[in-house]
Amino acid sequence: MNKTAIALLALLASSASLAATPWQKITQPVPGSAQSIGSFSNGCIVGADTLPIQSEHYQVMRTDQRRYFGHPDLVMFIQRLSSQVSNLGMGTVLIGDMGMPAGGRFNGGHASHQTGLDVDIFLQLPKTRWTSAQLLRPQALDLVSRDGKHVVSTLWKPEIFSLIKLAAQDKDVTRIFVNPAIKQQLCLDAGTDRDWLRKVRPWFQHRAHMHVRLRCPADSLECEDQPLPPSGDGCGAELQSWFEPPKPGTTKPEKKTPPPLPPSCQALLDEHVI
């Protein structure tokens, strides 16, 4: 097979992988009382709220992607956190992806963010508000060294520590995903007040942002919560295991076929997508 044919096949495969999912055809929230349905990586939402684009405390990035929808609890969390940050004079909170109008699967970039309870927040707090052009094409600030073993000391700021801690202390937050090197730095900086560290979980990538996840709302009866994180601050052997080389013979897990949708989410698709 010649190179042109190989390139064409690669392009077609790439295009297929980025093909729009049915959820992207739903352009407005589904009317009804707010209900997060299913799990974070296989679910949907009825009655999502739209995060107001204009705020003196935060700015929303990539608004052209229209990923600023979520459960009312998520919208209130963002407003609550950004107000705290502003009152402390720390800067402007930069909001990344939340979810789509009815939640559901993205065509790439996220496995979760499906039930309106997840949000990505940049780990930088500009003192000067970003321009429209900067918000549409945001420049992420990679806080982790090339070898992945520690944060870049010249980029790590006390304000970023405080931002993550404030988010983790929020009553509605159940998990915050950050790079292992960032978790390690939080462990070093935390001092004796360490209870909140339990919620901060090391995960792949997440070098420039934190992924905040809320607990299932009490009245979302079909929402599936994760088990609570292990007890303790998570700064011991589990964290160190992230820095160890992979064991010989370790291979990447095969990509799994997505599980069936929860019945309520399938019914929502059947009703709202032609």
UniProtKB/Swiss-Prot annotation:
Signal peptide boundaries: 1-19
What the record says about activity regulation is: Inhibited by Zn(2+) at 10 mM and by metal chelating agents EDTA and 1,10-phenanthroline.
**Annotated SUPFAM superfamilies:** Hedgehog/DD-peptidase
Top-level enzyme category: hydrolase
Keywords from the UniProt entry: Disulfide bond, Hydrolase, Metal-binding, Metalloprotease, Periplasm, Protease, Signal, Zinc
Provide the GO MF annotations for this entry.
endopeptidase activity; metal ion binding; metalloendopeptidase activity; peptidase activity; serine-type endopeptidase activity
Q: Which gene encodes it?
A: mepA
Its needed co-factors are: Zn(2+)
Provide the assembly information.
Answer: Dimer.
Per the entry, the cofactor note is: Binds 2 Zn(2+) ions per subunit. Zn(2+) ion 1 is bound in the active site. Zn(2+) ion 2 is bound at the dimer interface by residues from both subunits.
Q: Which GO terms describe its cellular component?
A: outer membrane-bounded periplasmic space
Q: How does activity depend on pH?
A: Optimum pH is 5-8.
The name under which this protein is listed is Penicillin-insensitive murein endopeptidase
Which EC number(s) does the record attach to this protein? 3.4.24.-
Q: Set out the biological process GO terms recorded for this chain's protein.
A: peptidoglycan biosynthetic process; peptidoglycan metabolic process; proteolysis; response to xenobiotic stimulus
What pairs make up the disulfide bonds?
Answer: C44-C265, C187-C235, C216-C223
State the family named in the UniProt similarity comment for this chain. Answer: Belongs to the peptidase M74 family.
Enumerate the residues binding Zn(2+) 1.
H110, H113, D120, H211
Something else the entry says is: In E.coli there are three murein endopeptidases: two are penicillin sensitive (DacB and PbpG), the other (MepA) not.
Region of interest (Disordered), ranges: 228-274
Pfam families from the entry? Peptidase_M74
> Which residues does the annotation say bind Zn(2+) 2?
D147, H150
InterPro entries (UniProt xref): Hedgehog_sig/DD-Pept_Zn-bd_sf, Peptidase_M74
Location in the cell reads:
Periplasm
Reported impact of H113A: Strongly reduces enzyme activity
Please give the function described in this protein's UniProt entry: Murein endopeptidase that cleaves the D-alanyl-meso-2,6-diamino-pimelyl amide bond that connects peptidoglycan strands. Likely plays a role in the removal of murein from the sacculus and could also play a role in the integration of nascent murein strands into the sacculus.
Q: Which NCBIfam families match?
A: PRK09429.1
